[in-house]
Curated annotation (Swiss-Prot):
Binds 16S rRNA, required for the assembly of 30S particles and may also be responsible for determining the conformation of the 16S rRNA at the A site. One of its GO terms (cellular component) is small ribosomal subunit. Part of the 30S ribosomal subunit. Contacts proteins S3 and S10. GO terms for molecular function: rRNA binding; structural constituent of ribosome. Belongs to the universal ribosomal protein uS14 family. Keywords: Ribonucleoprotein, Ribosomal protein, RNA-binding, rRNA-binding. PROSITE patterns: RIBOSOMAL_S14 (PS00527). Pfam families: Ribosomal_S14. Disulfide bonds: none annotated. The gene is rpsN. This is Small ribosomal subunit protein uS14. InterPro entries: Ribosomal_uS14, Ribosomal_uS14_bac/plastid, Ribosomal_uS14_CS. GO terms for biological process: translation. SUPFAM superfamilies: Glucocorticoid receptor-like (DNA-binding domain).
Length: 101
């Protein structure tokens, strides 16, 4: 189990990403637009730097919904490999079974 503080930190990051997503996207569009003047592009870079660091989507970490484990995360299920295996063995995930060949 991950610490509660780590789960809370990730939840806070998710809120910040959602809050600033539109603003970040518009600033990045200005920065990458070659038709905008150099001064305006530089001002957009400076504004982007003033946004909170945790508002960047790349700062988020996928975590298991049950345990908060950061490694071995399977996107399809939203769980870690350990919890997917446990659920699979109990028959809780329809259509998923242990491989045999």
């Amino acid at each position: 189990m991950a610490k509660q503080s780590m789960k809370a930190r990730e939840a806070k990051r998710a809120k910040l990403v959602a809050k600033f997503a539109e603003k970040r996207a518009s600033l990045k569009a200005i920065i990458s637009d070659v038709n905008v003047s150099e001064e305006d592009r530089w001002n957009a870079v400076l504004k982007l730097q003033t946004l909170p660091r945790d508002s960047s989507a790349s700062r988020q970490r996928n975590r298991c919904n049950q345990t908060g484990r950061p490694h071995g995360y399977l996107r399809k299920f939203g769980l870690s490999r350990i919890k997917v295996r446990e659920a699979c063995m109990k028959g809780e995930i329809p259509g998923l079974r242990k491989a045999s060949w």
